[in-house]
A protein has these predicted regions:
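Hydrophobic alpha-helical transmembrane segments of multipass integral membrane proteins
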Residues: 18-25, 119-129, 214
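Helix-loop junctions at membrane interfaces in 12-TM secondary transporters
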Residues: 26-37
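Alpha-helical transmembrane segments of multipass membrane proteins
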Residues: 25-26, 88, 159
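Substrate-agnostic recognition of the 12-TM MFS/MFS-like secondary transporter fold
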Residues: 1-21, 35-91, 133, 171-188, ...
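Helix-loop junctions on the cytosolic side of multi-pass membrane transporters
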Residues: 53, 57, 62, 110-148
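Helix-loop interface residues and adjacent transmembrane-helix termini in multi-pass membrane transporters
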Residues: 6, 30, 58-61, 111, ...
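Juxtamembrane intracellular "pre-TM" segments in multi-pass secondary transporters
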Residues: 135-175, 197
Length: 214
């Protein structure tokens, strides 16, 4: 959040997508998956405050609830679409088409379905980064990061405590935490169950996860 306030929100989202691309490249070139996932997660964590924070800079307070609803709805839709797309990318049909692509004089060294899928994700993040460059400057004054980042911890604790003590804040935080916590765990449970009980492939199980999510 402090990083999102220190720079224009569009630039923060651009840099965040760059971090995600770096994480994908790390996995593509053999870095331990846990480390690569951590880098991608860092980019996603930095992206979210800017994504929501820019609404307060672009819109009047009377439209924030409506705008937040659109953001939440599109986020959920993108997650479902991402699960379906990921399942298709590692499936035999799509991966065979991707691996059969031949670029003259270019050796991509991409020889497996996961590598092809990660390459497509890199292009998706590049497209998202291009859209980030089209976000206009809002003219809102920036708040510089403190010299000692540790000082952000007491501020975070204070803000978090105030939210949980507020009745409407409690409802919002509890509902959001429950929703994302349950949906995140359910996704992996359905994937594992579909493979063990139904004998589904990753592609088929991903499609089932999309249906369950809807």
């Amino acid at each position: 959040g402090a990083f999102a306030d220190a720079l224009p929100k569009g630039r923060v989202m651009l840099l965040s997508n760059g971090i995600k691309i770096a994480g994908c490249l790390m996995m593509l070139f053999g870095t331990h998956p846990l480390m690569a996932y951590a880098i991608v997660g860092l980019g996603a964590a930095a992206y979210s405050p800017a994504k929501y924070g820019i609404l307060t800079e672009l819109l009047p307070s009377s439209q924030l609830v409506k705008a937040n609803g659109w953001i939440e709805g599109l986020t959920i839709a993108s997650i479902i679409l991402g699960v379906l797309l990921g399942g298709q990318l590692v499936g035999q049909t799509m991966s065979h088409k991707l691996l059969s692509l031949d670029f003259p004089l270019i050796d991509t060294s991409i020889n497996t379905a996961p590598e092809a899928a990660i390459s497509i994700l890199i292009f998706v993040y590049l497209a998202a980064a291009w859209f980030n460059t089209r976000i206009p400057l809002t003219g809102v004054p920036m708040r510089a990061l403190p010299n000692n980042l540790v000082t952000l911890l007491p501020d975070f604790w204070h803000c978090n405590t105030r939210l949980w003590r507020d009745r409407l804040g409690q409802i919002s935080l509890a509902t959001t935490t429950l929703f994302w916590g349950v949906s995140g765990n359910l996704r992996y449970i359905v994937l594992a169950w579909a493979a063990a009980a139904l004998g589904y492939s990753v592609t088929q199980a991903s499609a089932l996860v999309g249906v369950v999510a809807i």
